[in-house]
Amino acid sequence: MSISESSPAATSLPNGDCGRPRARSGGNRVTVVLGAQWGDEGKGKVVDLLAQDADIVCRCQGGNNAGHTVVVDSVEYDFHLLPSGIINPNVTAFIGNGVVIHLPGLFEEAEKNVQKGKGLDGWEKRLIISDRAHIVFDFHQAADGIQEQQRQEQAGKNLGTTKKGIGPVYSSKAARSGLRMCDLVSDFDGFSERFKVLANQYKSIYPTLEIDIEGELQQLKGYMERIKPMVKDGVYFLYEALHGPPKKILVEGANAALLDIDFGTYPFVTSSNCTVGGVCTGLGMPPQNVGEVYGVVKAYTTRVGIGAFPTEQDNEIGELLQTRGREFGVTTGRKRRCGWLDLVSLKYAHMINGFTALALTKLDILDMFTEIKVGVAYKLDGETIPHFPANQEVLNKVEVQYKTLPGWNTDISNARTFKELPVNAQNYVRFIEDELQIPVKWIGVGKSRESMIQLF
């Protein structure tokens, strides 16, 4: 006899609620900042803006393959692994379980930024690291380089990775052979044994790989002493933050939607989920605590490394965008490929992430153009397609349909309100809003914190 047929508990309430108390909902909401293109959109600047009155700033995925630049008081800080919001002295920075951590890289990054200015004073007391975060070892990075070399030799092309060990460490994680922060700080003898097993596995897979096992363990022991006070139960920490007194919690996404391991232009992607779902799995929090989701969009499009790029301008236009925008990767120093804004890919990113508003950055880079093109549709074999193709070969074949808008030929870098922008610049912003059906909340017209125009 089934409950649905005869149990009074199933029928006692009109809504089918069996009389049990509902789980407590509510709590603080997190504000999420995500890249909506192929990275390098200016997420760091938006985070810097929001972090000024934040209590906690989180990283939920990726490693030191990401690159964020923040300019404060004319000092340029570069972040790869640390949440860039840590530059606010009142912020607690949290690195979640979805992040992969190269300890030498973490301390090197912190020390370089400490030398630049006062932004990172006391950072070690303001950083919390999830005990469930996986560790990137030097041999992961070495293996990354060997894999790229093998791809080049075998297929004539590589993935264009940053060689920071991100793919190999996420592979170790999925294969359940990886090591986590909790292993390092809880039982170093047990950690050492597992480290040796993993290192020897890598040596058997890559015979040319040289690993100084004892030397690296000695180095890791030194890092363990420094890192131990920062390592906490991340799930408990965040739960307390979400359900305690009111707090402003900010999540800083790394990489971007089109680099997501599932939804990006696979295989030319990163190895983590950099869309909104990665926020919940990478921090250990339920989706009902996600509040605003801000997508960061460059006023044109760039991409580092190889992979399909429908609106790319491999010509004087692309060169002008590259030069004016100073489009070099923060992590690798590689030139970024440049092209027109692609609304097809942005609509796709919105379908996945549900952006509540956009930050449109680097609008000033378009100042010199008499006309500006925007990709509004893809055609394949002469027919418009309603979706963003999953297959790279198909994406490489699409013909982009453009809408041409008049430029403004005016320096807009001193504009501080929307009304101060030329009419054609205003129209460009409104066109993007109308096409995507997402409001633009900020417009970037320069590098500094002050050059972000807020619309609402």
From Swiss-Prot:
Inhibited competitively by AMP and IMP and non-competitively by fructose 1,6-bisphosphate. Pathway: Purine metabolism; AMP biosynthesis via de novo pathway; AMP from IMP: step 1/2. It is an enzyme of class 6 (ligase). Residues 1-14 have a biased composition (Polar residues). Its main location: cytoplasm. It comes from the Eukaryota. Optimum pH is 6.6-6.9. InterPro entries: Adenylosuccin_syn_GTP-bd, Adenylosuccin_syn_Lys_AS, Adenylosuccinate_synth_dom1, Adenylosuccinate_synth_dom2, Adenylosuccinate_synth_dom3, Adenylosuccinate_synthetase, AdSS_2_vert, P-loop_NTPase. GO terms for molecular function: adenylosuccinate synthase activity; GTP binding; magnesium ion binding. PROSITE patterns: ADENYLOSUCCIN_SYN_1 (PS01266), ADENYLOSUCCIN_SYN_2 (PS00513). Binds 1 Mg(2+) ion per subunit. It is found in: Cytoplasm; Mitochondrion. Plays an important role in the de novo pathway and in the salvage pathway of purine nucleotide biosynthesis. Catalyzes the first committed step in the biosynthesis of AMP from IMP. PANTHER family: ADENYLOSUCCINATE SYNTHETASE (PTHR11846), ADENYLOSUCCINATE SYNTHETASE ISOZYME 2 (PTHR11846:SF13). Belongs to the adenylosuccinate synthetase family. Homodimer. NCBIfam families: PRK01117.1, purA. This is Adenylosuccinate synthetase isozyme 2. The lineage of its organism: Eukaryota, Metazoa, Chordata, Craniata, Vertebrata.
